[in-house]
A protein has these predicted regions:
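Conserved small/polar residues in nucleotide/adenosyl-binding loops
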Residues: 680-686
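Short pre-active-site segment immediately N-terminal to the catalytic Zn-binding motif
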Residues: 480-495
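Active-site recognition of the HExxH zinc-binding catalytic motif
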Residues: 491-506
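Post-HEXXH active-site segment of zinc metalloproteases
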Residues: 507-530
């Protein structure tokens, strides 16, 4: 609807106005940087000046200012027009948006107990503020008037999209509901936002609280040297000198499951990882999931939908539940069959070593690595020296330059969201500034898990001039020990290309209104997944896949083995992904929520009825499935496989020309796909 509501997606759902007057500078505090124009290079947030104490007064003032702007729109004596209503609404909330981008971004990558407490305090206010806008009858009347008389305003394509999206956001926000139902909707929106927040905070605590402490060096058998060095460093940081510590962060737990010879220790860390949020402690998420699914269903019913998935999917390319399930059901049998073949290979490896047991979940990665080596003579550790992080970064920049002519230059003297983050200026092929890209690579305790692309400022136009975006890509790679290189796996390298594809989507954005920058959830993964294709192209590998010590380009024999073995393991990967997609959908197609809903039993039935083998858990189990429970991919986790169909088609357009950097195809892809307002244009399927 406007830039403020859009910014909410970065951290919290925007909400309530407060009429409290706050001094710009609290007694004894430093000046609040949010109350002045940023004087930093390219106008990025002054991270080095922002303190936690600055957020609350700035957010309260931002909400107050936007409320006054809304009042002015409503009180305008002139007849509603596109400019005095739709554009005015789109441009409202400048301060609030400014603060939300900083607050949302930093609470995701550098959260603290103080920030989490502030989130719990502000969520109800922000939820109310959002509803105060969406449920303002006088404001909606003006929006509706413009919508119903749009022919008289002679709008261009972008203006029509803004009008349609604005009107739709009010309708989907409950503007047409009677007052009693609007009151109930407010309650549900606040409840949902708080439950989503609680879920995320609990998951982070569960991830951070566990440590596998190893005292005996023999228990490290099988682990690569750099993994051992990092575990020793983690132990030292926790005051456990002389020991080794492994955590539930992926760069720590995954190598342990993949290489550690000690089966009992693999079991211990595997169970800790897959039971996050399900330990019957203060961070338990089972009741949170139950209440959240129930509240979403109640909201959907209130809005006139039979279930929450129907409410969500109406806005997506899939449109309805049948289309989603048809896609998942089409892929599931072959994926599961392939996973069972891989399981047979794994059990064969166990028997080869004299084991008299069948594989369990904590055995899969360990014995799969052995099976792959037996089949293809390929060890993941053979490839890692060729995927040094700095080289991989140069690889993605090379691809972008070859495709679009854009360049990335590191900026040293600029505020950063974290001291370890890097900043780059992106310039178009004609030298004009496109935006700033942050890259935050390494895991740390206050950082959310996984990898994602976000932003600290959206692109728009102000006074006729383009306001460039500030984009950030966030990862959770293991930070190397002092003086050691950051060596990535092939999967981690693919992740860098993936998130960079999202970043290009943000950097290329060129719209005049905040409200037209959104695209359907099941489309948004297309730019990222297309970018992955270049990661393994021989022409690109020769540029970035160089040995970190010798500079030798990755040998063709190793590339051949990597390509040959590329599909091995897809049974596991696709099955665990589809299992999570089914879990997400099945929660949100429920037509009623039993009072005694047992989350563990529900999950077991959803996956058991489809024949999921016990050795493969869902990629995310219910109690730590942030994609769906925290709101970003609710009834939308299927989007990755949906977009995969599109990205294969899109990359094929390059391959058919015989040039993976074909400038004509690249130009069309940028124009029709990487510009959000034009997401529907794909190849010949326009």
């Amino acid at each position: 609807m406007n830039k403020t509501l859009m910014a909410a997606g970065l951290a919290v759902i925007l909400g309530a106005c407060s009429s409290s007057k706050k001094s710009d500078v609290a007694e004894g505090a430093t000046p609040n940087p949010f109350f002045a124009e940023y004087t930093t290079p390219f106008g990025v947030p002054p991270f080095d000046q922002i303190e936690v104490a600055h957020y609350k007064p700035a957010l309260l003032k931002g909400m107050e200012e936007q409320s006054k702007e809304i009042e002015a729109i409503v009180a305008n004596p002139d007849a509603p027009t596109f400019e005095n209503t739709i554009v005015a609404l789109d441009q409202s909330g400048e301060l609030l948006t400014k603060v939300m981008y900083a607050f949302g971004g930093q609470s995701s990558v550098n959260t603290t107990d103080e920030i989490q407490e502030l989130e719990r305090e502000l969520y109800p206010l922000l939820s109310k503020h959002s509803d105060d806008i969406s449920l303002n009858p006088q404001l909606f009347a003006r929006v509706k008037s413009v919508y119903e008389n749009q022919a008289s305003f002679h709008l261009d394509k972008e203006q029509k999209k803004l009008l349609e999206e604005t009107y739709k956001s009010f309708v989907r926000g409950g503007a047409n509901l009677p007052e009693d139902k609007q009151a109930k909707l407010r309650e549900l929106n606040e409840k949902i936002s708080m439950l989503q927040l609680t879920f995320g905070q609990n998951t982070l605590k569960e991830t951070n609280d566990f440590q596998l402490v190893i005292d005996n060096k023999e228990d490290l058998s099988g682990l690569p040297e750099d993994v051992i060095v990092k575990a020793a460093q983690t132990a030292q940081e926790n005051g456990l000198d002389g020991k080794w510590v492994f955590t539930l962060h992926n760069p720590s737990v995954m190598p342990f499951l993949q290489y550690a010879d000690k089966r009992d220790l693999r079991e211990k860390i595997f169970k800790a990882y897959t039971n996050r949020g399900n330990n019957n402690n203060e961070n338990d998420n089972k009741e949170v999931v139950k209440q959240l699914v129930a509240a979403r269903l109640e909201k959907a019913r209130l809005m006139g939908y039979e279930d929450y998935a129907a409410f969500v999917l109406e806005e997506n390319m899939a449109k309805n539940e049948k289309n989603v399930y048809d896609l998942l059901d089409k892929i599931w049998p072959s994926a599961l069959a392939k996973a069972k073949e891989e399981l047979a290979d794994i059990n064969a490896e166990i028997k080869k070593e004299g084991g008299n047991y069948e594989a369990e979940g904590w055995d899969w990665r360990y014995y799969f690595e052995k099976a792959k080596k037996a089949k293809y003579n390929l060890d993941e550790n053979e490839m890692r020296p060729y995927f040094e992080l700095g080289h991989v970064r140069e690889g993605i920049f090379y691809v972008a330059n070859k495709l679009y002519g854009i360049t990335f230059t590191e900026i040293k003297d600029i505020p950063k969201p974290d001291p370890d983050a890097l900043a780059f200026e992106c310039k178009d092929k004609d030298g004009t500034h496109l935006g700033v890209l942050y890259m935050d690579f390494f895991t740390r305790p206050g950082k959310g898990g996984g990898a994602w692309c976000g932003g600290y400022r959206s692109q728009t136009y102000k006074d006729g001039k383009r306001v460039a975006p500030v984009v950030t890509t966030v990862f959770n790679f293991s930070k190397p020990a002092e003086g050691q290189p950051a060596l990535l796996t092939a999967d981690e390298t693919e992740t860098v290309f993936h998130e960079f594809g999202h970043a290009l989507h943000g950097l290329f954005c060129d719209v005049h209104y905040y409200g037209v920058s959104d695209v359907p959830r099941d489309f948004v993964e297309l730019p990222s997944q297309v970018d992955e294709h270049w990661a393994v192209e021989p022409e690109v590998l020769k540029v970035y896949a160089k040995h970190y010590q010798t500079g030798e380009v990755i040998p063709q024999a190793l590339v051949d083995k990597m390509i040959k073995s590329g599909k091995y393991g897809q049974g596991f990967a696709t099955t665990e992904y589809l299992a999570a997609s089914y879990l997400d959908m099945d929660y949100h197609v429920l037509k009623e929520i039993p009072a005694d809903l047992d989350i563990e039993k529900f999950e077991a039935k959803v996956l058991g009825d489809r024949g999921l083998i016990r050795q493969i858990p869902s990629r995310y189990r219910s109690t730590y499935f942030g994609h769906t429970m925290e709101g970003g991919y609710t009834a939308g986790y299927y989007s990755y496989i949906w977009a995969e169909v599109l990205d294969c088609d899109a990359f094929q357009a390059y391959k058919e020309t015989g040039n993976i950097f074909n400038p004509e195809v690249a130009s069309k892809f940028r124009k029709y796909v990487l510009t959000p307002v034009s997401y529907t244009h794909l190849r010949a399927h326009e």
